């Protein structure tokens, strides 16, 4: 099935339904996310925010409905979609036995990049001087910034981020917000969850999708 959408639409959902343990987390949820959009998924704990992000990233299947990358079901264009997708879950995905530099190097290389300066990238997330520190010895904030560093060297259009501001201080949150705006202005989109208020991305720039679960 082909979904007819706007030429600016990068990602769309058609009648997505998700059920977990006899709870309907969301039902026949449809929306379009366009180039330039910054979208926050809202809802109480257990409402299905992470489940929705995982479905959009193709990591979980919905009970019903489809997700489309441009005009194609993501299950029919998996390679193309994955090349244009950066997904960061609420877990950092950082290996404790590797240094900050080794983690970044590993993450960028498995994403297909081979020309980058890890020290310069880590400096952008205030990790200068910690390049050789084992990730297991870093603070929670440094650990999270190690995971987020790949955002500063990435050409994927679609960013799906689960709680990117966790353990990040106010300055770090502002720097991430500025990066999100720049990415969107360059034709990408950002889909995220967060429990924190955003100070730089204003309501007129931020789209919101709210989830509220109910029992079957």
UniProtKB/Swiss-Prot annotation:
It comes from the Bacteria. GO terms for biological process: cytochrome complex assembly. One of its GO terms (molecular function) is ATP hydrolysis activity. The keyword Cell inner membrane applies. Pfam families: ABC_tran (PF00005). Keywords: ATP-binding, Cell inner membrane, Cell membrane, Cytochrome c-type biogenesis, Membrane, Nucleotide-binding, Translocase, Transport. ATP binds at residues 43-50. It is found in: Cell inner membrane. Its main location: membrane. SMART domains: AAA. One of its GO terms (cellular component) is plasma membrane. InterPro entries: AAA+_ATPase, ABC_transporter-like_ATP-bd, ABC_transptr_haem_export_CcmA, P-loop_NTPase. It is a peripheral membrane protein. It catalyses: heme b(in) + ATP + H2O = heme b(out) + ADP + phosphate + H(+). Part of the ABC transporter complex CcmAB involved in the biogenesis of c-type cytochromes; once thought to export heme, this seems not to be the case, but its exact role is uncertain. Responsible for energy coupling to the transport system. The complex is composed of two ATP-binding proteins (CcmA) and two transmembrane proteins (CcmB). This is Cytochrome c biogenesis ATP-binding export protein CcmA. It comes from Shewanella oneidensis (strain ATCC 700550 / JCM 31522 / CIP 106686 / LMG 19005 / NCIMB 14063 / MR-1).
């Amino acid at each position: 099935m082909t979904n007819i959408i706007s030429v600016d639409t990068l990602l769309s959902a058609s009648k997505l339904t998700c059920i977990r343990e006899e709870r309907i987390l969301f039902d026949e949820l449809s929306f379009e996310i366009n180039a330039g959009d910054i979208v926050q998924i809202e809802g109480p704990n257990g409402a299905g925010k992470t489940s929705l992000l995982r479905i959009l990233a193709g990591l979980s299947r919905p009970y019903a409905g489809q997700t489309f990358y441009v005009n194609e079901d993501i299950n029919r264009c998996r390679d193309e979609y994955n090349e244009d997708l950066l997904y960061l879950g609420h877990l950092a995905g950082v290996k404790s036995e590797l240094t900050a530099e080794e983690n970044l190097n590993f993450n960028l290389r498995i994403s297909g990049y081979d020309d980058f300066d890890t020290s310069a990238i880590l400096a952008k997330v205030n990790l200068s001087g910690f390049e050789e520190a084992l990730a297991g010895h870093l603070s929670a904030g440094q650990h999270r910034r190690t995971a987020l560093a790949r955002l500063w060297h990435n050409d994927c259009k679609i960013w799906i981020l689960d709680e990117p501001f966790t353990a990040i201080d106010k300055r770090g949150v502002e720097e991430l917000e500025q990066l999100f705006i720049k990415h969107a202005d360059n034709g990408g989109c950002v889909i995220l969850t967060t429990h924190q208020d955003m100070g730089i991305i204003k309501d007129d720039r931020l789209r919101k999708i709210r989830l509220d679960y109910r029992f079957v």
